[in-house]
Amino acid sequence: MGLLTILKKMKQKERELRLLMLGLDNAGKTTILKKFNGEDIDTISPTLGFNIKTLEHRGFKLNIWDVGGQKSLRSYWRNYFESTDGLIWVVDSADRQRMQDCQRELQNLLVEERLAGATLLIFANKQDLPGALSSNAIREALELDSIRSHHWCIQGCSAVTGENLLPGIDWLLDDISSRIFMAD
């Protein structure tokens, strides 16, 4: 993140953040976003492109970009990297078959220059499903302990029940604000 970007954000009275939500298809990105925003989650279909939600939380204006995760759409992810303050990587904890794909795609993102400095929150979603991998198992599978380029945190959660969505988002906001906003 360049100095001008930091200065611009410090001057803004309205503390506005750009969050990018990515992950493989069917990980639960849209469900997390809708649940966090208090919307109905009964009928959610795959995101073919992207959704943008703007919501207020803890005095922040959050612009959350929810981008489809189908293999055919992943090459377009780079179009959304610019000015990203926080990256939310959503993992389907019950999808053991694709954990290696998930790890590879995350590693590809973390070397992107335009995401340098962005705080990383990993939501280990679908913890309510039988057979879901624990946060620690996902931490190992995704080799998270090797990440040195970003501040990161893994949070087990359930988009369906809403469990642990708030603590994850709160950690993300705390980390971002400690980096880019001056104390009031």
Curated annotation (Swiss-Prot):
Stored CDD domains: Arl2
Cross-link Glycyl lysine isopeptide (Lys-Gly) (interchain with G-Cter in ubiquitin), where in sequence: 71
Gene3D superfamilies according to UniProt: P-loop containing nucleotide triphosphate hydrolases
Subcellular location: Nucleus; Mitochondrion intermembrane space; Cytoplasm, Cytoskeleton, Microtubule organizing center, Centrosome; Cytoplasm
Impact upon substituting residue 70 to L: No effect on tubulin degradation or cell detachment. Does not reduce TBCD-dependent tubulin degradation. Reduces slightly interaction with TBCD
Domain of life (superkingdom): Eukaryota
GO biological process, one term: regulation of glycolytic process
GO molecular function: GDP binding; GTP binding; GTPase activity
UniProt KW keywords: Cell cycle, Cytoplasm, Cytoskeleton, GTP-binding, Isopeptide bond, Lipoprotein, Mitochondrion, Myristate, Nucleotide-binding, Nucleus, Phosphoprotein, Ubl conjugation
Modified residues (Phosphoserine): 45
Expression tissues: Expressed in liver and retina (at protein level).
Post-translational modification as stated in the protein's UniProt record: Not N-myristoylated.
Covalent lipidation (N-myristoyl glycine), chain numbering: 2
InterPro entries per record: Arl2, ARL2/3, P-loop_NTPase, Small_GTP-bd, Small_GTPase_ARF/SAR
GO cellular component term, pick one: mitochondrion
Family recorded in the similarity comment: Belongs to the small GTPase superfamily. Arf family.
Subunit structure: Interacts with ELMOD2. Interacts with ARL2BP; the GTP-bound form interacts with ARL2BP. The GDP-bound form interacts preferentially with TBCD. Interacts with UNC119. Found in a complex with ARL2, ARL2BP and SLC25A4. The GTP-bound form interacts with PDE6D. Found in a complex with ARL2, ARL2BP and SLC25A6. Found in a complex with at least ARL2, PPP2CB, PPP2R1A, PPP2R2A, PPP2R5E and TBCD.
Function field: Small GTP-binding protein which cycles between an inactive GDP-bound and an active GTP-bound form, and the rate of cycling is regulated by guanine nucleotide exchange factors (GEF) and GTPase-activating proteins (GAP). GTP-binding protein that does not act as an allosteric activator of the cholera toxin catalytic subunit. Regulates formation of new microtubules and centrosome integrity. Prevents the TBCD-induced microtubule destruction. Participates in association with TBCD, in the disassembly of the apical junction complexes.
The protein's name: ADP-ribosylation factor-like protein 2
Organism this protein belongs to: Bos taurus
